């Protein structure tokens, strides 16, 4: 009897794993976006290259009401996806910086590795540091990279 129970548990877990792997991560729902909920506020330290222009810390609430925000979660160990999208985000920032604020959130990473990544791609939009990934949890992030689009009023429009 005990053997059958163990086999049943293994089969059930295997089935759940298989089902999860069939899902398209781009189609995973975001409750924040679906219900246009307010973006969770946060204050995080800016990485050193951005402090002269943006200050020591970045607080989301200080930037609401001015322009939409593109909030991108990334990590240096996120390969190849983060490496592929970094130049696209930088080009978009350079093209639309007057209309849209881009903010990078380096998450669950080592600061030295994050700085190396930033230098490699010449990222000029502000980058904050969240080594424990707490802000990503507040946003319901599934993994990196993940980008949230926040309107002027501070509501999450899309993920």
Language model regions located:
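Conserved helix-turn-beta segment immediately C-terminal to the redox Cys motif
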Residues: 67-68, 85-106, 119-120
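Conserved redox-active cysteine motifs that mediate thiol-disulfide chemistry
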Residues: 73-91
């Amino acid at each position: 009897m005990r053997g059958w129970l163990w086999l049943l548990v293994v089969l059930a877990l295997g089935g759940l794993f298989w089902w999860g792997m069939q899902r398209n991560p781009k189609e995973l729902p975001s409750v924040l976006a679906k219900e246009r909920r307010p973006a969770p506020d946060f204050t995080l330290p800016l990485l050193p290259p951005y402090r002269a222009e943006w200050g020591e810390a970045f607080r989301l609430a200080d930037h609401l009401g001015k322009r939409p925000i593109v909030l991108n979660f990334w990590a240096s160990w996120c390969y190849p996806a983060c490496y592929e999208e970094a130049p696209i985000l930088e080009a978009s920032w350079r093209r639309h910086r007057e209309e849209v604020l881009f903010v990078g959130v380096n998450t669950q990473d080592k600061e030295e590795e994050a700085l190396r990544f930033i230098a490699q791609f010449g990222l000029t939009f502000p980058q904050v540091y969240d080594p424990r990934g707490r802000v990503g949890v507040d946003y319901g992030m599934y993994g990196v990279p993940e980008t949230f689009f926040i309107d002027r009023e501070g509501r999450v429009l899309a993920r």
